[in-house]
Amino acid sequence: MALTQGPLKFMDVAIEFSQEEWKCLDPAQRTLYRDVMLENYRNLVSLGICLPDLSVTSMLEQKRDPWTLQSEEKIANDPDGRECIKGVNTERSSKLGSNAGNKPCKNQLGFTFQLHLSDLQLFQAERKISGCKHFEKPVSDNSSVSPLEKISSSVKSHLLNKYRNNFDHAPLLPQEQKAHIREKAYKCNEHGQVFRASASLTNQVIHNADNPYKCSECGKVFSCSSKLVIHRRMHTGEKPYKCHECGKLFSSNSNLSQHQRIHTGEKPYKCHECDKVFRSSSKLAQHQRIHTGEKPYKCHECDKVFNQIAHLVRHQKIHTGEKPYSCNKCGKVFSRHSYLAEHQTVHTGEKPYKCEECGKAFSVRSSLITHQLIHTGRKPYKCKECDKVFGRKCFLTSHQRIHTRERPYGCSQCGKIFSQKSDLIRHRKTHTDEKPYKCNKCGTAFREFSDLTAHFLIHSGEKPYECKECGKVFRYKSSLTSHHRIHTGEKPYKCNRCGKVFSRSSNLVCHQKIHTGEKPYKCNQCGKVFNQASYLTRHQIIHTGERPYRCSKCGKAFRGCSGLTAHLAIHTEKKSHECKECGKIFTQKSSLTNHHRIHIGEKPYKCTLCSKVFSHNSDLAQHQRVHS
């Protein structure tokens, strides 16, 4: 009498290895075996063909040996007299498998699926012939073909042709045949989205109203109970899987397994295009999109496409303005967790990124990468306009705006535009008067963290930047760069009005105010205006009577540093500034500059009322009294 055929089970399609056979496989082949078995089981579950059994996935994820799989199949006969698999009669399997009469099992997606024992035996027979039973036919170490891949083409063709009419997706076929079938696209009946085989199956199950695996906390539905169990741990915070190397905890065993590869150095997933290896299959899949150029994730706001969903999610925060990450110290909010982590080092003073060459530490990884270019000297990015080279592409992009005069960053408050985003961010703080970075030594506050870092050097007395030409040391790298131009004679900053060149950009900016007549710095006491902030600062000392610069030799005090420097020459009798024309020497460089005008006949100071010119500013000031 013909028996009713039960539902297909995971063990029906599982390829088993004995303990002796298992020893013939290398680590990569064992990983491949587990991945294939896990994928097949999950596809069966997603189709509703077998009951989700956590013990099976647990065994595979925990990397237990495959011969621990214990099957409970019973053998029965179908109406044709062939042997077929009869599964355990659980409540759900009965619901899915025990159809009226002798009808074959029909899964949730509506296509007929039968797999007879005789077909499975073909697999087992071929594997034993080509495999290594009891070490009688050991696998060669030089062989690149795993036992899983040695199923003959005749057997594969037999199964493919037989079941192709029943289902196109073929989730249980060998990987080689799945590759052919995957070329065909599959469409979800709910919202029309197109998937490849496994994705379409999973997606269809999610839409199925009969799906029982729903999270009671957030309403999210899952295709199998194991995924729901893992998901629930997000709400409970449970992390039952612990790494014995470092003690780190994980919510799922698969995450632990992936993490442990950091300690072992194992990278079993290899890219066939460039031979690069990866710890996880998901990282390999992401990497392969570099070769294919595939960017499947599209922003519906601006149509920009991305090769990773994480990049799309991050990008969408630009449109929404969402900044979910808040600093618990100062309340500042960020769009990315990485930005928050970098910011928090301001409060902690932590510098986790250390240079292996010189031991210098940095709070931000990007700063370390920039610093390492000093040691390597590598500058692969070249400007086509001026041939200047840069260590990073972003530096080149910023530099090129000098040539294009592009200023894409505009202030919404005053309309001022900038070529660099960092300049705009710095400028915005002038509207708010925000100075979040405070010195814990003297209480001085700064708008920028870099300004605070530079200020710290005043207290420490540290001058880490040394000139290789003369040995002079500086607090700031920019000061060393400017100083170095004394030796090279380089003056890269040129005035477009008169062609005068300068070694510093700040000197050019000050000079250009002569042409524009701009004097933006005004004294609150007397209303006098100046074209440089330093001139205003020096002037304000007249009102306060302050003389902060004191001579350590005689105690005489001065308003400005230059006055003290000139005075110190009296004590040392040092006259280091010599005129090359006549040999006369001076204690101050400014005195030499004034003297040098006698030889060249330069008279740069002009009276605006009568156009008379003078070689010294003091002579002009004295002359202007005639008009007043």
From Swiss-Prot:
Keyword Zinc set for record: yes
Keywords: DNA-binding, Metal-binding, Nucleus, Repeat, Transcription, Transcription regulation, Zinc, Zinc-finger
Molecular function terms from GO: DNA-binding transcription factor activity, RNA polymerase II-specific; RNA polymerase II cis-regulatory region sequence-specific DNA binding; zinc ion binding
SUPFAM superfamilies xrefs: beta-beta-alpha zinc fingers, KRAB domain (Kruppel-associated box)
Source organism superkingdom: Eukaryota
Residue intervals of the KRAB domain: 8-79
Role this protein plays: May be involved in transcriptional regulation.
Family stated for the protein in its record: Belongs to the krueppel C2H2-type zinc-finger protein family.
Name the UniProt record assigns to this protein: Zinc finger protein 528
UniProt source species: Homo sapiens (Human)
Lineage: Eukaryota, Metazoa, Chordata, Craniata, Vertebrata
Gene: ZNF528
